[in-house]
A protein has these predicted regions:
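A short beta-strand-turn-helix
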Residues: 36-57, 228-249, 269-274, 320-323
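Bacterial Sec-dependent N-terminal signal peptides
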Residues: 1-24
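Thiol-based oxidoreductase modules, predominantly thioredoxin-like and allied folds used
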Residues: 87-111, 127-137, 279-293, 305-315
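A short, hydrophobic beta-strand/beta-hairpin element that forms part of a small beta-sheet core
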Residues: 36, 150-167, 331-346
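Conserved redox-active cysteine motifs that mediate thiol-disulfide chemistry
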Residues: 63-75, 253-270
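Short, internal strand/loop/helix patches
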Residues: 110-149, 153-154, 162, 297-331
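Short pre-active-site segment immediately N-terminal to redox-active cysteine/selenocysteine motifs
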Residues: 55-57, 62-65, 247-249, 253-257, ...
């Protein structure tokens, strides 16, 4: 069943979505670069004129969430560093509408593709090029017609398109053997014809605004999933903590009467939907009194927590000592455990959701 879920997720990521007849076609070789006016993560607004000092211009359509795009982030930075002194300017554009992205398309990332999250990625990765947001309407991106993230367009001094396609031939960092974008730049800088002007592009499909219905459909499907809660005793807790499977486990301890628990709980539901098709499992444990099991189930149902949910049926202090010796006992409490039972992350109190997602994705992996 999990293998089928992963296969479906791969289809969502990578298959061409031919049902969208309005998907744009790539700009043709020899065409002029369409102008744009887009906000950058650095607070500036950029048009083509902002790059007039460069003899050549590389526009890369990329995004935060896509594992392929993330796999190429460092390579794009390296290209920008290598060719800046040769008169080559670089700019990255995110064409994706954030509202057209399903949570289960975020399984390889800590960040989605909102403008605010782009600012975080640009800061975290210290991009050495402007990173522009076109997710409001995707209008500028449609004029270029990127087919996947990442997709490279290289223009000469007259801003005529000379190369379009992939960066290189291998997604996995350090394994490329054909460096198409680099070869194109070398030729242009040397005043020679580009050896290969156009290639196909492998990566995540562009999340155009007309794909919002697809994302909304997922929300409706998740709302129909069954929610259950089982009782958990001390022996079962120890088995759970040994984590003898292959998945990383995120354990959230909560109660219906705990205000901070209730406030942060939707973050865990989101993380479950993001990462559950990976080597990841969310487990929630309620410390409500056992006679309030129906109340706990009612809360979980309202929150659509269709994960593995428990309510502890033993002594609370025995539970505290049995879960984590470093836990003082206040709720909420969160643990992230590796296969084999090693505690990677422990937090008493409300989590920093972004920080926790970073911990998770660095363990389960950002790329294929």
């Amino acid at each position: 069943m999990k293998a089928l879920a992963i296969f479906i997720l791969l289809l969502v990521f990578f298959l061409p979505e031919t049902v969208h007849a309005s998907d744009p076609v790539p700009l043709a070789i020899g065409a002029a670069a369409p102008d744009f006016s887009l906000p950058g993560t650095d607070g500036k607004t950029y048009t083509l004129k902002n790059f007039a000092q460069y003899k050549f211009l590389v526009i890369v359509f990329t995004c935060n969430h896509c594992p392929t795009a993330q796999a190429y982030e460092d390579r794009i930075k390296q290209l920008a560093a290598d060719y800046n002194s040769k008169g080559v300017g670089f700019v990255a554009v995110s064409p994706n509408d954030p509202e057209a992205i399903r949570l289960d398309e975020l399984g390889y990332t800590d960040l989605s593709d909102t403008f605010q999250e782009m600012k975080i990625r640009a800061r975290d990765k210290q991009f050495n090029f402007p990173y522009l947001y076109d997710g409001e309407t995707s209008a500028a991106s449609k004029l270029y017609g990127p087919q996947a993230t990442p997709h490279v367009f290289i223009f000469d001094g007259k801003r005529t398109l000379r190369y379009t396609g992939r960066i290189d031939d291998k997604e996995k960092p350090g394994t490329a053997t054909v460096h198409d974008a680099r070869h194109a730049l070398d030729a242009l800088v040397a005043g020679k014809p580009v050896p290969v002007e156009k290639t196909k592009t492998f990566g995540c499909s562009i999340k155009w605004p007309d794909k919002r219905d697809f994302a909304n459909q997922a929300v409706g499907e998740w709302a129909k999933e069954k929610v259950t809660i089982d009782e958990l005793n001390g022996e079962q807790l120890q088995v759970l903590l040994k984590n003898e499977g292959t998945n990383y486990k995120l354990i959230n301890v909560w109660a219906t009467w705990c205000g901070p628990c209730v406030a942060e709980f939707p973050e865990f539901v989101n993380m479950n939907r993001m990462y559950r098709n990976r080597e990841f499992e969310l487990v929630t444990i309620s410390l409500d009194d056992i006679n309030r099991k129906p109340n706990a189930l009612n809360f979980l149902t309202k929150k659509q927590a269709s994960t593995k949910n428990y309510i502890f049926n033993g002594d609370k202090y025995a539970f505290i000592d049995g879960l984590d010796k470093n836990w003082e006992g206040s709720l909420p409490y969160t643990l992230f455990i590796a296969p084999g039972g090693k505690i990677i992350y422990g937090k008493q109190g409300v989590i920093d959701a972004l920080a926790l997602k970073k911990v998770i994705v660095e363990k389960i992996g950002r790329v294929y």
